[in-house]
Design a protein with these regions (language model features):
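Dynamic "connector" segments at or just before major functional cores
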Residues: 1-129
Length: 129
C-alpha cells in the first residue's frame, strides 16, 4: 500500500509577487549586496524577500511575520517549522544588513532592471530621491 502525504498551502498573490520580483532580479541583487555567511540559518535574500511578500500581501509587525508565513511555507494548520525561522530577530538583523549595504548601487541596479524589463522610457530621468 502506498502512503501518500499531502498538505494545503496558501498561495494568494505570491505567484504574482514572485513573477515581478524575478523580472527585476530582486533576489539576485540582495544576494549580491548582502551575502549569506555560513552561520546564518536564513539567507538575507530569503528573509528580505519574505518581508516584501508580507508587506505587499498582508502587512504585519515583524513579530507576526513568522505566524503569517506558516500557511505559505508549512501548510495550513501545520506546525510552523520552516516559518519559525523568519522570526522578528532574523528579520530585524537582515534589515540592519540591508541598511549597512551599498543601498545606492543596489537601488541603481534595481531601477536599471525595471527599465530593461518593462521597456520604460528614459528620455527624462529624475534621480533625486
Amino acid at each position: 500500500m502506498v502512503n501518500i502525504e499531502s498538505k494545503a498551502q496558501m498561495l494568494d498573490v505570491q505567484p504574482l509577487i514572485t513573477h515581478y520580483m524575478d523580472q527585476l532580479s530582486v533576489r539576485q541583487l540582495l544576494e549580491k549586496y548582502i551575502p549569506k555567511t555560513p552561520q546564518m540559518q536564513v539567507a538575507p535574500a530569503d528573509a528580505l524577500s519574505m518581508l516584501v511578500f508580507n508587506i505587499i500581501n498582508a502587512p504585519n509587525p515583524l513579530y507576526k511575520v513568522s505566524e503569517w508565513a506558516a500557511d505559505y511555507l508549512d501548510g495550513i494548520g501545520e506546525k510552523p517549522r520552516e516559518a519559525e525561522k523568519y522570526n522578528d530577530d532574523c528579520l530585524g538583523r537582515n534589515l540592519d544588513r540591508l541598511y549597512g549595504c551599498n543601498r545606492d548601487e543596489l537601488m541603481i541596479e534595481l531601477a536599471a532592471n525595471a527599465i530593461h524589463a518593462h521597456h520604460l522610457e528614459t528620455d527624462k530621468i529624475h534621480n533625486d530621491s
